[in-house]
């Protein structure tokens, strides 16, 4: 059997980088993406330093842009000839509320993440069908089920992604292609550290107090690591996860209270 090929978006930092490193440990051929060429080249160097024999292709570009997306998938097909795993990992839009949201920003967020994920799945699945195998993992978030008052648009778009993913999973299941959503909670990434700063400013408290306040709302009393999230993604990308599809799985230390 040929080595599996995985395409990881947003792989220059945080969860995306951790997933790329984890899949490299498991001997996947990798296509890694980020908007910043220098940053993603640095990740390639990290992978090759640990796995000199690894196959790593860098394709820089903004995956929220339709034309960039089309070009990158064309390159994956021409340079790899196959695609087995897709990690959809694009950040959402800026915080907003129902009172201050506007149509322009809502439309931009919908295009930036929701439409981009669905289009990427459409393009990736056409390649996966050639080998009757595929693993599609959408990085979403718990806001889809427990909306945040200050994340009005993102909460709504995440719910749309969960719904679309469930629908798509039914269509692709006969082709042995699974589609699942991975929903991180508070994970120690740059985005989390920005959130800590916002809590500090809002409450006029120290960084330590802000982090303690956040951790107090998590049953495990700590934030997660990108590596813990990557371990779950790697399992969903594996042969062992062959009967898991159409699911929404949280890596959040028990934060989500709904069932």
UniProtKB/Swiss-Prot annotation:
The gene is bacG. Changing residue 158 to A: 5- and 2-fold decrease of the catalytic efficiency and the affinity for ex-H2HPP, respectively. Induction: The compound guanosine 5'-diphosphate 3'-diphosphate (ppGpp) is essential for the transcription of the bacABCDEF operon and BacG, and GTP regulates the transcription of both this operon and ywfH via the CodY-mediated regulation system. Its main location: cytoplasm. Its EC number is 1.3.1.-. Changing residue 155 to A: 5.5- and 3-fold decrease of the catalytic efficiency and the affinity for ex-H2HPP, respectively. Belongs to the short-chain dehydrogenases/reductases (SDR) family. SUPFAM superfamilies: NAD(P)-binding Rossmann-fold domains (SSF51735). NADP(+) binds at residues 12-15, 34-36, 62-63, 90, 113, 185-191. Pathway: Antibiotic biosynthesis; bacilysin biosynthesis. One of its GO terms (cellular component) is cytoplasm. Homodimer. InterPro entries: NAD(P)-bd_dom_sf, SDR, SDR_fam. Keywords: Antibiotic biosynthesis, Cytoplasm, NADP, Oxidoreductase. It comes from Bacillus subtilis (strain 168). GO terms for biological process: antibiotic biosynthetic process. It is found in: Cytoplasm. Along with the bacABCDEF operon, BacG is involved in the biosynthesis of the nonribosomally synthesized dipeptide antibiotic bacilysin, composed of L-alanine and L-anticapsin. Bacilysin is an irreversible inactivator of the glutaminase domain of glucosamine synthetase. BacG catalyzes the stereoselective reduction of exocyclic-delta(3),delta(5)-dihydro-hydroxyphenylpyruvate (ex-H2HPP), adding a pro-S hydride equivalent to C4 position to yield tetrahydro-hydroxyphenylpyruvate (H4HPP). This is NADPH-dependent reductase BacG. GO terms for molecular function: NADP binding; oxidoreductase activity, acting on the CH-CH group of donors, NAD or NADP as acceptor.
